[in-house]
């Protein structure tokens, strides 16, 4: 069997290759706890199971049923196809061959970028309630992250799928790491958004916003560089991180010289600085995944 891959290369497979059986798993209810059962659902999803059955020895309580449904709603492509008093059957309805790791990563990056931009804008305008909006979007980042991890794990176990996705073994590993950094950045931004409303000093707001704007550009360059394998942008991110550190140190100096009478404000400044640094480090780490030119280009006179 001959198949054309996304990079226009051709893959040959034995003509007698059989279609893979649908992967199914049964999870007993009640388990040790509802939290343990939900973790099993997440684990089965990430391991690539197509059908996940919750098998009850007794009726599934209303509260537990709602928690199970809430957990399943967090998993892209997983839909409840049947249920009764003691059973819940869900199925993954997306075709892995139609998914694209790059598009999912870009989607994650777009959501995270929007979270960060709105956090800074809300901070500048001193708007209330922005942290709740950010937290809800962080949940969507997690959903996309789980989908990408599922796809990557499936590709690791299925060379045919990996070939269709145009991903080498190293690419698969790099996408997994990059996605993890994006997911972590979403969590750090949620922490960042929680700390900012407490800060009200004009000079501190100005300096934190200045440093924060630099982090925004770092994300754009690191993710674009990673996807396009552009080492130049990777080097720019590292240089920008050095400049960012200078701005952070300046913010720390201002905070020590500024008369802050509330302990909560002092703690909020420290949390915001610490959170911004963790976010920036995520972009540096993604930039570090970009292969050097000598690993992506053929050697001359070889």
What are the residue ranges of the model-derived segments?
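Cytosolic, long alpha-helical scaffolding segments
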Residues: 1-302
């Amino acid at each position: 069997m001959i198949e054309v891959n996304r990079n226009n290369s051709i893959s040959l497979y034995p003509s007698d290759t059989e279609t893979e059986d649908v992967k199914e798993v049964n999870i007993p209810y009640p388990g040790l706890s509802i939290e343990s059962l939900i973790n099993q659902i997440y684990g089965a999803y990430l391991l690539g199971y197509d059908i996940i059955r919750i098998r009850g020895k007794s009726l599934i309580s209303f509260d537990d049923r709602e928690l199970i449904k809430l957990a399943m709603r967090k998993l892209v492509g997983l839909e409840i196809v049947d249920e009764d008093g003691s059973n819940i059957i869900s199925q993954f309805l997306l075709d892995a061959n139609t998914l694209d790791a790059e598009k999912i990563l870009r989607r994650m990056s777009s959501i995270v970028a929007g979270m960060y931009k709105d956090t800074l804008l809300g901070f500048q305008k001193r708007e209330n309630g922005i942290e709740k909006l950010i937290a809800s979007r962080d949940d969507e980042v997690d959903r996309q992250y789980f989908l990408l991890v599922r796809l990557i794990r499936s590709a690791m176990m299925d060379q045919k799928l990996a070939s269709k996705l145009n991903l080498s073994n190293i690419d698969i590993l790099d996408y997994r790491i990059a996605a993890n950094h994006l997911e972590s950045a979403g969590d750090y931004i949620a922490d960042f958004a929680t700390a900012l409303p407490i800060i009200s000093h004009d000079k501190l707001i100005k300096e934190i916003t200045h440093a924060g704007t630099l982090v925004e550009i770092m994300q754009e360059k690191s993710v674009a560089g990673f996807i396009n394998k552009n080492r130049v942008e990777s080097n720019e991110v590292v240089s920008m991180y050095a400049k960012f550190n200078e701005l952070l140190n300046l913010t720390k100096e201002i905070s020590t010289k500024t008369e802050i009478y509330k302990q909560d404000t002092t703690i909020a400044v420290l949390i915001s600085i610490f959170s911004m640094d963790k976010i920036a480090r995520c972009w540096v780490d993604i930039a570090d995944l970009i292969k050097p030119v000598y690993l992506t280009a053929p050697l001359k006179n070889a």
